[in-house]
């Protein structure tokens, strides 16, 4: 009996159609990334080897990844990696996957400070180290501390620091917001944060991809502002005079977060930074003490 031959081109075509039937947003791209991961090749290789037959071991490895994607797990959590700001982060389904929106915050900080600055950075809700490690990579004289309550996220953050050769310049600590710093005299030049900010009532509007990420990293209470209130209230205790804050916010939260900072009477030069979609995605301010 003639055995069916699955080439790279044929399996990609089948996968694209299958993902389309599941109403995936990027069916072709998802299939390409998953197959590239299985083969250990880049996506260009797929197009230059379209007629290459896949061996049984490759098909057996590919099938469960397709099934996971069909269940709504993100491609990044399936492959265990996500490219962000020119770096490849290790990720999994226990952490918030790095998103393009967050690049707006990092690019603003890099525009604010000179490349040779020797600032100290604190990252609250660091997750896999997305913001802090990206900044340290591009600011070679800076050092930083990353805090997170998740004992699942911190080992990944440390692995990423090791991958990027940053372990000597960064420390990660388990901490419920600022709890690990209370009672210390630590001061920082910059505090960054991408805290959970989705309103709990908005869960029904989220895609399955997002809902499969840890809810502790997504939801910021009924109004989405629980963690911004803590940041506004407590950042000043750990900032040098004229230090700065930079927070990622939900697409409609910038004005409210500005008011929270203003209400402390400690901040000036409060600004919004828009993302590529034109939404104010970052709130920054200078601490005056």
Segments predicted by a language model, with ranges:
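Conserved AdoMet
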Residues: 2, 35-111
């Amino acid at each position: 009996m003639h055995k069916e031959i699955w080439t790279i081109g044929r399996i990609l075509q089948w996968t694209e159609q299958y993902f389309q039937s599941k109403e995936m947003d990027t069916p072709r791209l998802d299939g390409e990334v998953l197959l590239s991961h299985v083969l250990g090749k880049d996506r260009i290789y797929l197009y230059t080897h379209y007629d290459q037959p896949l061996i049984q071991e490759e098909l057996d490895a590919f099938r469960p990844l397709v099934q996971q994607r069909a269940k709504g797990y993100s491609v990044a959590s399936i492959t265990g990696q996500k490219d962000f700001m020119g770096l490849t982060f290790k990720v999994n389904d226990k952490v918030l996957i790095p998103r393009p929106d967050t690049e707006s915050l990092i690019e603003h900080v890099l525009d604010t400070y000179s490349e040779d600055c020797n600032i100290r950075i604190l990252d609250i809700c660091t997750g896999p180290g997305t913001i802090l490690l990206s900044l340290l990579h591009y600011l070679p004289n800076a050092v930083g501390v990353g805090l997170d309550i998740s004992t699942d996220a911190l080992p990944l953050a440390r692995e990423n620091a090791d991958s990027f050769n940053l372990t000597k310049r960064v420390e990660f600590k388990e901490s419920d917001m600022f709890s690990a710093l209370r009672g210390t005299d630590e001061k920082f030049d910059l505090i960054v944060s991408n805290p959970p900010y989705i309103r709990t009532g908005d869960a029904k509007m989220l895609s399955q991809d997002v809902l499969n990420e840890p809810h502790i990293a997504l939801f910021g209470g009924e109004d989405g502002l629980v963690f911004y209130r803590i940041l506004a209230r407590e950042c000043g205790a750990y900032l040098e005079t004229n230090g700065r804050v930079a927070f990622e916010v939900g697409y409609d939260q910038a004005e409210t977060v500005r008011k929270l900072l203003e209400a402390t009477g400690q901040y000036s030069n409060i600004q919004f930074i828009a993302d590529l979609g034109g939404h104010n995605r970052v709130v920054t301010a200078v601490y005056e003490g």
